[in-house]
């Protein structure tokens, strides 16, 4: 990449781009001096791949966001065809009416309503017609009352059309030009528009673990209008932790504090589970180093109450997971009303605690469930354990107790009045029930002290519940250990 200012090689005919829209290093403070005057933007982004939420669910999410003490909802489902695949197309009358209702509902709750556009799959950055198409999209949204926008350039190859190769010094410079041009257009239409930008290198992993050395991020930091916020997911797409030092580092490169796109509770990459536990791996000390945090949660709407409310607790400075969870569960309990109960009976807090423990976080099980799994590992650590030992028998009983609690929870969930809530967890609870039942059946067999060399009589002891299919076959080729690392064997 060249050392001169980003715009230096651009054709003079590119509308909206001039030396006035680039920024030299000395014009912005280093971190220590990154812009700090903005209020923290906090809330939820519907930014996942897969089936989007319904209009009614989005209206309800606004209540959750307000109830959690946050201030923003970002409408950006990846598979809304007019956000990404057909980004040039404006919304029809019915779609526009729903967006207007969301804008008004957000305003009534004193929330920001932000709409994302991802002009990244086939955009020609130097093509005037593509910039005009983006402006038409923005103008329609402005007419609907939207003043907060996100332009997303994530999850795409770092390649450009031939015309862009001739027009721009780099891929990043093309995105800077396109985004700054859109922002200038918005500033001519409305006072104080808010724009967030999602870079293609949106985590340290995509910058090859060398954030200060990333030419792409350096160009974004130097060229992007300083009023435009930049999304960042942390060290990884889904980050186990986000440290203060890492945020200082990316802040220095971007010349602004990042807005965290929080994927901790996302599950669009793993269809086998939901993340219903509290936000973790983040300390309150990072709040002074960011301009915002929006959580991109589970596809299953009803699984997100605890994630949203514990995220709200975190941005208020509560970084003790157990404390945030304990506050969220009673607020969630009313959604678990049993049908035909007459007296508004709901599931107990102990049942909700187990539900969360079984569907906890991306990097660990719930504490109680993990302790019981550790006991199960010890029970199975020998081919033929001493099943007469008091410790073995006690552990066996505890695993049986876990099975019984999961069975009971599953049965109670089938009686919920809120069927969307039931279906959000049904496949995961079904699998948990089946697998722990098989575990107990195996432990029961071991407790009978079968002779060495005897095979477990699976056809007699359990139902034929054996998971197959293409994905499982591929996983068997490259099994992973507990940390997720691959291996292979012949």
Regions found by a protein language model. Name each.
Residues 23-137, 143-147, 187:
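Feature activates predominantly on carbohydrate-active enzymes
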Residues 320-490:
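C-terminal functional modules
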Residues 47, 76, 152-154, 296:
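Conserved residues at the C-terminal ends of beta-strands
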Residues 65, 151, 293:
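Conserved, mostly hydrophobic/aromatic
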Residues 9, 14-22, 27-31:
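Short, positively charged and aromatic/hydrophobic N-terminal segments
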Residues 45-48, 147, 159-319:
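Catalytic-core regions of glycoside hydrolase
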Residues 78-81, 154-158:
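Short connector loops/turns at beta-strand edges and beta->alpha or beta->beta junctions
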